[in-house]
Amino acid sequence: MNKSKVFRKSVMIIAAFIVMTFFGLVPGGENQNSGDENSNIENFKIVKPLPEMVYFGVGEKLVFAIQYGLIYAGDATMEIRNIAMLDSVKTYHVVSLARTNRAFDLIYKVRDHHESFIDYNNLYSIRFEKHLREGGFRRDETVTFDQKNHLAVYEDKKVGIPPMTQDFLSALYYVRTVELNTGEAVYLANHSGGKNYPIYVKVLRHETVEVPAGEFDCIVIEPVLKTSSIFKHEGKLTIWLTDDNVKMPVLLRSKVVVGSFEARLKEYTLSSAEPRVPQISREARNVR
């Protein structure tokens, strides 16, 4: 493969990282070495905690710079825009945008848009939308989660889902509401692309990191899919959340074959909403 093809492939992988890794969950595979002693999932206690307290709310906005090594590749944002009612269900409306910068636009332009509507009390997904604009590729898809009847409803099909199923965006918000203890792995049911993928969020350690937005004491987590077949490429995603009640993501790092990528928090606005105890349904309590 000549240098130009290698470069173009690398750019496409960067774009894919921005699209799929930014608050999606890159499959790490249970056999990969994370660099942490005893990091295999078998060494973690599997837990299924319910949400305890919600410290985020409308108005929270996180802005990340995406880097591939020393190369600035683009930006990604994640914002809780409003409270929305969907079929009488109160939800958080979360919008995530990812885009390559002008330099990368010349080679492979990305303007992707994901939306998640998260149940206000049970913190599971009610609807997930993705609107992909990647080079000449365009795709729009919406899935509605009928959590009562355990169905993911697409325009042309219905798929059975486990109770309390998450999409890739809602999964992160759920994790932010539960207690995270080192040595434990939080189990989440996840659905994407017409298939169900269990996720185990390993809680690795505590450490301090510095990003453009400042220095933060963090708890380090690593989400792992039970199967690695969801993506063609494999990489390990590590996420640094603030080690406080808010659990704000400040750094995401993914190692893949061609190098490593980082999403580093550069700006943030926290919500002025008061912390609250979510009113978990009886069904949700029974299944967790």
Language-model segment annotations:
Residues M1-N2, L169:
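Helix-centric, low-specificity signal for extended rod-like, repetitive segments
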Residues K3-I14:
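Bacterial N-terminal signal peptides that target proteins for export
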Residues S4-K5, L172, S281:
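General helical secondary-structure elements
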Residues M12-I13, A98, P163-M164, I230:
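Alpha-helical interaction segments
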Residues L25, N33-F145, L180-R288:
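Acidic, serine/threonine-rich low-complexity disordered tracts
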Residues G135-T177:
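Hydrophobic, well-structured mid-protein blocks that either form specific transmembrane helices
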